[in-house]
Amino acid sequence: MVSIRVICYLLVFSVLQVHAKVSNANFNSQAPQMKNSEGLGASNGTQIAKKHAEDVIENRKTLKHVNVKVEANEKNGLEIESKEMVKKRKNKKRLTKTESLTADYSNPGHHPPRHN
């Protein structure tokens, strides 16, 4: 009984190894075909990894371009607002809106400003 079980396990193990070798061989032969179709309907892990690698490279190029633009603006003398300056400007804008909303509109000729 034990020997039959061992033989079955060995048989299953050998079948799985043969299947892995065959599927790996088929995978390598199909890779150029998928490359020509530009990955339409592809579910290969390598193609997904390549796509992610391309995205990372593109993002790095974009970040590099943004950094170059910031450095160019600094060289041209354009002032780049710091977070504190932006915060102050937005706070000032918010306060002026609050003042206009709480203003006394009892005068019939006075119309409230439009806030778009």
Swiss-Prot record:
Q: In which tissues is it expressed?
A: Expressed in root tips, only in the quiescent center and the columella stem cells.
At the top level, the lineage of the source is Eukaryota
According to the UniProt entry, its GO molecular function terms are: growth factor activity
Gene disruption phenotype: No visible phenotype, due to the redundancy with other RGF genes. Hypersensitivity to low phosphate ion (Pi) with respect to circumferential cortex and epidermis cell quantities. Triple mutant rgf1-rgf2-rgf3 shows a decreased meristematic cell number resulting in a short root phenotype.
Identify residues that carry Sulfotyrosine.
105
Reported induction: Not regulated by auxin. Accumulates in both root epidermis and cortex after phosphate ion (Pi)-deprivation.
Q: Which UniProt keywords apply?
A: Differentiation, Glycoprotein, Growth factor, Hydroxylation, Secreted, Signal, Sulfation
Compositionally skewed regions (Basic residues) per UniProt? 86-95
Description of post-translational modifications: The tyrosine sulfation is critical for the function of the peptide.
What positions are modified (Hydroxyproline)?
113
Residues of the propeptide: 21-103
Annotated region (Disordered) at: 82-116
Q: Name one GO biological process term.
A: positive regulation of cell population proliferation
> Which family does the entry's similarity section mention?
Belongs to the RGF family.
Query: What is this protein's record name?
Result: Protein GOLVEN 11
